[in-house]
Amino acid sequence: MTKFVFVTGGVVSSLGKGIAAASLAALLETRGIRVTILKLDPYINVDPGTMNPFQHGEVFVTDDGAETDLDLGHYERFISTKMTRRNNFTTGQIYESVIRKERRGDYLGGTVQVIPHITDEIKLFIRNGVSDAQVAIVEIGGTVGDIESLPFLEAIRQMSVQLPHHDTCFIHLTLLPYISSAGELKTKPTQHSVKELREIGIQPDVLLCRSDRPLPLDERRKIALFTNVREESVISAIDVDNIYKIPALLHEQMLDEIVCHRLGILAKPANLTTWKKLIHALEHPEHEVSIALVGKYVDLTESYKSLSEALIHAGIHTRCKINIHYIDSENIERHGTGCLANMDAILVPGGFGKRGVEGKIMAISHARNHQIPYLGICLGMQLAVIEFARNCLQLENAHSTEFNPDTPYPVLGLITEWRDRRGQIEKRSPQTDLGGTMRLGGQECLLKPHTLARKIYGTDKIIERHRHRYEVNAEFIPQLEQAGLQVSGLSAAENLCEMIELPQSRHPWFVACQFHPEFTSTPRNGHPLFNDYVRAAISFADKSGHAKLRDHNMQKNVATDSTH
């Protein structure tokens, strides 16, 4: 039977419950325990697919085509278990399911209430999401005290009563603010947060105390005394410069051992060799490159979380320090491409809407004309096609029907029909609802021989995850190819254009894909596309002299530091 670890948060939001849950899962996995993670989101949206990235951050797409919370990306990057649509559910999904049952008459005419019907449905969704895992870590979104979270907290309280004593463990993540005028960490917010949790009926077994400095022993004892938690179970979760250091940080304080003891699990000792190698590679780079990420959501970098992590993973596997420069494409529209002058590579990610599109096209043109390594993802591929059509085919005003329905040269258009991996036909029209209706999840792509894409992947068949409505218009592909643009990947089912590139005789590294390779990158393995992209950036830096300039500046800084 599956055992459960419930992770809650207090004081403020965005403390890092997802990273804490993923780090604990990674530790348990190194001990030979089959583990999975669930994320419960209290918002009423059915999923985050239609939410503004500035409000929610990135939408992470699972292999089975679910649009989920970005925390599921952290889960997949930290453990080997692949997430599915069952690993993330929202208040919207719970109410939708309960109302559907009520309409069918499943409740036999009874009055449908939050307790027991909503809480029972939450418990059912949790049990359905654990699969065959020995331990399921369940992260409750939001903050203790939020009205929206109450049904979820009540549901997990009920589970702790209904399951055997050693089958549940509660971890509460809280904040210890440092007051500089007093010169101390303040424990009162943590005490009140735990008090509120206990009023609901939940007693934490472990406290993770987030702070910017180590937790003094006296303060640890004080917290333990006032929250009814054992002293060794009050864990100091200090800020680190890289999230991949957190498993080792928590292991040093025996979090995995405490949880195993609470759950009555006998497991082999944790083996952090792989994690230590990753950290060593991160901290001892042999190269350094600057990559321009040209987007429209750059004011909230969480919107590109998987992408930035994939670049870091590539840095690990190429022994390269990656400096990501987030550049607003609207600034390029206003001020030109001067901000790209010292970049070693340019990347245009996915996105929706017309705002900032012309700035991205200008960045792509700059990369193509100046032989700078370019990687386009989703919209980044579509705009590369538009840029090529306008400037190499001389198709003035070529565009996507997403941005200009009346364009004389619709080089991209709405996908109206495709076959998913289950073999089912999906159909769409401009009148279709926006939520959950894109081409989503893992799709098979066939790579053409003698292409850079085929060389990078080392195989002729790949599966990558998609999230888009628009595709390259097949009517224009012969013209594009005749002008020198190479279609290097096609979908196996419909022959849709999935990858494009410029021959290396015309450009050293210009590759774009319709899918999202960042969703399958992990720190352990990286991703072949990002790894090769960073190698191309290193080569460009060496040839352009950027690498020598950085080495000179680094040596100058070291010399300056030694004189002080």
Swiss-Prot record:
Keywords: ATP-binding, Glutamine amidotransferase, Ligase, Magnesium, Metal-binding, Nucleotide-binding, Pyrimidine biosynthesis. Pathway: Pyrimidine metabolism; CTP biosynthesis via de novo pathway; CTP from UDP: step 2/2. It is an enzyme of class 6 (ligase). L-glutamine binds at G351, L379, G380, M381, Q382, E402, R469. Transmembrane segments: none annotated. Its EC number is 6.3.4.2. The keyword Magnesium applies. PROSITE patterns: GATASE_TYPE_1. ATP binds at S14, L15, G16, K17, G18, I19, D71. One of its GO terms (cellular component) is cytosol. Residues 1-265 are annotated as: Amidoligase domain. CTP binds at S13, D146, I147, E148, K186, T187, K188, P189, T190, Q191, K222. InterPro entries: Class_I_gatase-like, CTP_synthase, CTP_synthase_N, GATASE, GATase1_CTP_Synthase, P-loop_NTPase. UTP binds at S13, K186, T187, K188, P189, T190, Q191, K222. It holds the Pfam family CTP_synth_N. GO terms for biological process: 'de novo' CTP biosynthetic process; pyrimidine nucleobase biosynthetic process. It catalyses: UTP + L-glutamine + ATP + H2O = CTP + L-glutamate + ADP + phosphate + 2 H(+); L-glutamine + H2O = L-glutamate + NH4(+); UTP + NH4(+) + ATP = CTP + ADP + phosphate + 2 H(+). Allosterically activated by GTP, when glutamine is the substrate; GTP has no effect on the reaction when ammonia is the substrate. The allosteric effector GTP functions by stabilizing the protein conformation that binds the tetrahedral intermediate(s) formed during glutamine hydrolysis. Inhibited by the product CTP, via allosteric rather than competitive inhibition. The active site is at C378 (nucleophile), H516, E518. Belongs to the CTP synthase family. HAMAP family: PyrG. Catalyzes the ATP-dependent amination of UTP to CTP with either L-glutamine or ammonia as the source of nitrogen. Regulates intracellular CTP levels through interactions with the four ribonucleotide triphosphates. CTPSs have evolved a hybrid strategy for distinguishing between UTP and CTP. The overlapping regions of the product feedback inhibitory and substrate sites recognize a common feature in both compounds, the triphosphate moiety. To differentiate isosteric substrate and product pyrimidine rings, an additional pocket far from the expected kinase/ligase catalytic site, specifically recognizes the cytosine and ribose portions of the product inhibitor. PANTHER family: CTP SYNTHASE, CTP SYNTHASE-RELATED. This is CTP synthase. It comes from Nitrosomonas eutropha (strain DSM 101675 / C91 / Nm57). The lineage of its organism: Bacteria, Pseudomonadati, Pseudomonadota, Betaproteobacteria, Nitrosomonadales.
